[in-house]
């Protein structure tokens, strides 16, 4: 497929969350966060595995209490994906999970306490060889910054971020990434743009509290899409009030749309009209659900008639062009036969799986190639 993309990634330093590289032109990693009670070890482990099954590179787990920290110890032993511990208010929890082998600590300067406490967290991170994510959020800025700016502004988020960066620099600690999240799309965009010009550490992208699955995905796609198209961002999370697996799917969809990183099938489908010769919407919905396990990147066009079908099939890995009773099937732009419209879902699924097996290029981050 013709690609007009000319994204030049912002230069950044590299850190590792577990074995996943972040920054310095590493593939943009996609992460999510569990929403189970962390003290429910079985439920949390099950959700981590579900997230991993749809492509999560990193999973964040909230650790609000010492009891949750003890549960985290058990969870970490059962997880094969890198885990980030989300810490607020009590810095001692960060020290405890560091002992338990956490892969990254996420702290919020607005509520973690004094610089002395942050100093202790940094010392622990250094000792255990783990990075820190500094999470700046428009809804929880430090009190003096709130009083100065009266409301969240890009300058307020930047000041909060640079305060922490300067402190970490004084401690000679450079193993960190940083985020400046806001629920307002423009506030987030401008905050990240400002920060990107001031530091070279990796940036964690996100629109915080974006909303439900539909509206939140759209807000995140607009905000993160603009930043990513400008080369800003090294890892991302799509924050949705929905099943966390939807965050991973949305994250990959955004990266896929910008041709930055692909995972699984990119379906190209018409919105349908009276010319469609088979149920396009039902076919696409069924195949998206059936083929969630496919990680091989490929473009599959499903067009209900001959107006645009042949043209889309020409530039797709596989394509279907609607025709009466039997629709045309294309592979790599060449017509390869016809599919029975009554059996089109089963037949197309088989074709896609066969092609995926042939290509066999799993698009996960390959550590040994970086």
Swiss-Prot record:
Its EC number is 1.17.7.3. Pfam families: GcpE. SUPFAM superfamilies: Enolase C-terminal domain-like (SSF51604), Nitrite and sulphite reductase 4Fe-4S domain-like (SSF56014). Belongs to the IspG family. Pathway: Isoprenoid biosynthesis; isopentenyl diphosphate biosynthesis via DXP pathway; isopentenyl diphosphate from 1-deoxy-D-xylulose 5-phosphate: step 5/6. Binds 1 [4Fe-4S] cluster. It catalyses: (2E)-4-hydroxy-3-methylbut-2-enyl diphosphate + oxidized [flavodoxin] + H2O + 2 H(+) = 2-C-methyl-D-erythritol 2,4-cyclic diphosphate + reduced [flavodoxin]. HAMAP family: IspG. It is an enzyme of class 1 (oxidoreductase). Its cofactor is [4Fe-4S] cluster. The keyword Iron-sulfur applies. NCBIfam families: ispG_gcpE, PRK00366.1. One of its GO terms (biological process) is terpenoid biosynthetic process. InterPro entries: Dihydropteroate_synth-like_sf (IPR011005), Enolase-like_C_sf (IPR036849), IspG_bac (IPR016425), IspG_bac-typ (IPR004588), NO2/SO3_Rdtase_4Fe4S_sf (IPR045854). [4Fe-4S] cluster binds at residues 270, 273, 305, 312. Converts 2C-methyl-D-erythritol 2,4-cyclodiphosphate (ME-2,4cPP) into 1-hydroxy-2-methyl-2-(E)-butenyl 4-diphosphate. This is 4-hydroxy-3-methylbut-2-en-1-yl diphosphate synthase (flavodoxin). Keywords: 4Fe-4S, Iron, Iron-sulfur, Isoprene biosynthesis, Metal-binding, Oxidoreductase. GO terms for molecular function: 4 iron, 4 sulfur cluster binding; 4-hydroxy-3-methylbut-2-en-1-yl diphosphate synthase activity (ferredoxin); 4-hydroxy-3-methylbut-2-enyl-diphosphate synthase activity (flavodoxin); iron ion binding. The keyword Metal-binding applies. Signal peptide: none annotated. Gene3D superfamilies: Dihydropteroate synthase-like (3.20.20.20), Sulfite Reductase Hemoprotein, domain 1 (3.30.413.10).
């Amino acid at each position: 497929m013709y690609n007009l993309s000319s994204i030049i990634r912002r230069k950044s330093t590299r850190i590792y969350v577990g074995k996943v590289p972040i920054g310095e032109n590493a593939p943009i990693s996609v992460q999510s966060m569990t929403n189970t009670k962390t003290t429910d070890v079985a439920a949390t482990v099950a959700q981590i595995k579900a997230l991993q099954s749809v492509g999560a590179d990193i999973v964040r787990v909230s650790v609000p209490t010492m009891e949750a920290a003890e549960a985290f110890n058990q969870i970490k032993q059962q997880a094969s994906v890198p885990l980030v511990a989300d810490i607020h208010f009590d810095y001692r929890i960060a020290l405890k999970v560091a002992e338990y082998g956490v892969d990254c600590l996420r702290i919020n300067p607005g509520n973690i306490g004094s610089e002395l406490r942050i100093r202790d967290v940094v010392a622990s991170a250094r000792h255990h060889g783990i990075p820190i994510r500094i999470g700046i959020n428009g809804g929880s800025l430090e009190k003096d910054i709130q009083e100065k700016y009266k409301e969240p502004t890009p300058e307020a988020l930047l000041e909060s971020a640079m305060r922490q960066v300067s402190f970490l620099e004084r401690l000679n600690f450079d193993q960190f990434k940083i985020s400046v999240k806001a629920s307002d799309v423009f506030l987030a965009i401008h905050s990240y743009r400002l920060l990107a010009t001031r530091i070279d550490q990796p940036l964690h992208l996100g629109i915080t509290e974006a909303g439900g699955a539909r509206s939140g995905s759209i807000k995140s796609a607009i905000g993160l899409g603009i930043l990513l198209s400008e080369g800003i961002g090294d890892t991302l999370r799509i924050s949705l009030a929905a099943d966390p697996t939807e965050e991973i799917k949305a994250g990959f969809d955004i990266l896929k749309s910008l041709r930055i990183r692909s995972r699984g099938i990119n379906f190209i489908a018409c919105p349908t009209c009276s010319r469609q010769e088979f149920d396009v919407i039902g076919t696409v919905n069924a195949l998206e659900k059936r083929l969630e396990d496919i990680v091989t990147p490929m473009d599959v066009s499903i067009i209900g008639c001959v107006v645009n079908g042949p043209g889309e099939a020409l530039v797709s890995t596989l394509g279907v062009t609607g025709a009466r009773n039997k629709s045309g099937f294309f592979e790599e732009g060449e017509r390869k036969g016809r599919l029975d419209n009554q059996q089109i879902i089963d037949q197309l699924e088989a074709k896609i799986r066969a092609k995926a097996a042939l290509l066999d290029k799993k698009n996960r981050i390959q550590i040994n190639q970086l």
